[in-house]
Amino acid sequence: MDFNYNSNHLEGNTLTYGQTEILLLFGKVIGEADVRDVQEMTASNVGLRMMSEEASVKEVPLTQNFIRTLHKTLLREDYTVYRELPGGVQTSYVIHAGQYKTRPNSVITRYGDRIEYASPEETPSLMTDLVDWYNKAEQEGKLSPVELAALFH
């Protein structure tokens, strides 16, 4: 309950703790609530259960397919992002649920520096490397689950 509420609240979800509790325990919404917030909280709960179930089966290694399925569960559906480029030019692109990115992405820090992330072309092989590293590290058992999760994240 706490994880779902806090995680979604950090992302801007407006459901109160009480609304979250009633939604996740009884599948009902009390008071006024944004439909998207309800859908996001519900999807988050399903995703958390998926991860818990997957983690409970130690013999099953992490796979890229599971990561993409989890992504599709959390996003629920494809959606369009609208952006304004320098000079006021409008652009848009589609984020595909359950698929690796199809276009470059970056962030601009509060100091104005741009940080570029892996290109769409690099992403599949980098994900292979990440999943292979994770499975090897988990099998070796040298890291605690918290350390492993923190490094993976």
Feature locations, PLM:
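FIC/Doc superfamily catalytic core
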Residues: 1-153
